[in-house]
Amino acid sequence: MSKLVVCLTGMPGAGKSTIVSKLKEEGYETFSLGDGVRAEAKRQNLEPTGANLGKLMLELREKNGPGAIAELLKESIKESTHQIIIIDGVRSIHEINVLKETGNVKLLAVDAAPDTRFNFLRERKRSDDPLTREKFEERDNREIGVGLKEIIELADESIENNNVTINQMVESATKIFQKWIE
């Protein structure tokens, strides 16, 4: 049986990483495309600011093609002994095409209202999170520019992260995975 590769997508702050961290606690194997970029930034001795990571993401795609970020994780996914792999932060069809080389890919979109996302990102305080509405909108536009809007529209399923608990959101995602396995 080939691996089920569940790719989570959605705008920054929609709740993808929150779902992934809970699924990891439940024993799922998880990978983050953003972590791949952060690891590359560390390798290049770049400070992991939003501007630096965004610039690096674009440079990697320009230099190595639009699926470059997924290529950073492809071998690790192939080598995994888990039958279900969760991928956080897929942004383009090109990344999906790379990931299809590792197993049966399904795409789950996580959706949240802009105010919800902005407030979450401000509270999360990761080094690349925007602290102003202007930076938030710049980041959204950059993500849309690499194909995020199109990939969200192609999702096999989607879940809402507006006025729900983390557990409700994870439960919704898990039910979808189970349906995909059957």
Predicted regions and their residues:
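P-loop (Walker A) phosphate-binding loop of NTP-binding proteins
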Residues: M11, L23
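Hydrophobic positions on the alpha1 helix immediately C-terminal to the Walker A/P-loop
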Residues: I19
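ATP-dependent small-molecule kinase phosphotransfer cores
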Residues: E29-I86, V90-N97, K135
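Conserved phosphate-donor/acceptor-positioning beta-strand/loop module used by diverse small-molecule
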Residues: D88-G89, L99-K125
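Conserved lysine of the Walker
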Residues: K16
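Small-molecule kinase domains that catalyze NTP-dependent phosphoryl transfer to phosphate-bearing small molecules
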Residues: G67, R124-S172, I176
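Well-ordered beta-strand positions
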Residues: E29, K106, D156-E157
